[in-house]
């Protein structure tokens, strides 16, 4: 019932006898439920009665699996414990989100820059613009490859068109990333310098100077970098990464000291770090930037599921909530600068959340995860990862995260997002324990749906 998801075990000491994978996955799920109940002060069954019921059943199945007479019985009981445990942890995560969401927005409305989306600069504002009216802000990707396809020849046609549209409509803009070394980000003529930073640094600076000078008065927040810590374009010394970020940061401050700056991190789960040489974890990277004295106003986090790239594969709601909890206590506000799920299956390894990915399943995921994220008091805003499919294609080779078709036709997730944003334009009122709620409409801002 949970789908095809990435799960984990507890840290296991080496031993001669092989571990039973299903049993250890169930053990970790039991541990996660207990740990988060303690962390969130959710031990009272009245806060999440369905979660408590499923946990008790999962614990009984796990206990029986530990003393099962044979491996077949153990496997069946462990599988049942995993299934029930997944239900329990997801229900706990959503119950906790419901409480915090009402605590945060019970007496006040959400800010005027709560919900955004990422557009594809190659699309036509006249066609896509009307579908952006319900969103508070817009992220405009800036790709060096498209702006300077020939060295020294800059083409700002697409960016000018969208920045003009944003100015005319009064939409706040997040622009960037300015520094991006991922595959396909560099112009063809600059690829020969990919691993020669001394030669790449000057043309990179020239590009940054052109972009920042042109748009400094029109951009509300600059996304300086996105996922540089993962070294997806090949190994790169951290000193070069820091130098590139510092160059962009100082250039922005030189033109406008009050300009807001953001650093975006990818793969909060550490999948890429374990696979790609030279990569470091998102949280370690942020600590390193702080130690180097780099200044930025916000942290951006990419939270993608259903993709084929490590760090974007399907995961359960509790894992997503727990990953966001790791930002608690950071002095910088958090933006979910790219949050999304696909509307179709993207291939082997992408997984699925319950049923296969479809437009309706994408909408159901959004109705759960967006309220869950906004319930975190340190989350400042959320941007959907792709307004149309080609805005931020899955690095694994496919695209399908859009909430609007290329011709401007909305998908079901679009309606869910607009409905949630509309709901947060007025106070939610006090939280009422489960069982005392009147029937809720599907996909309301509190995260309850007919799912």
Please give the residue ranges for each predicted region.
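Long amphipathic alpha-helical scaffold segments
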Residues: 58, 64-122, 129-130
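Amphipathic, heptad-repeat alpha-helical segments
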Residues: 2-60
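Aromatic-lined carbohydrate-recognition surfaces of secreted/lumenal glycan-active proteins
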Residues: 115-119, 224, 245-280, 332-345, ...
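Acidic (Asp/Glu)-rich catalytic clusters
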Residues: 126-135, 160-172, 212-217, 253-255, ...
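Short, acidic/polar
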Residues: 120-132, 201-211, 276-289, 363-372
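Substrate-binding cleft and catalytic face of glycoside hydrolase catalytic domains
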Residues: 137-150, 160-270, 341-343
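Substrate-binding cleft/loops of secretory-pathway carbohydrate-active enzymes
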Residues: 267-300, 392-393
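Aromatic-rich peripheral "rim/lid" segments of glycoside hydrolase catalytic domains that contact
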Residues: 200, 214, 228, 232-247, ...
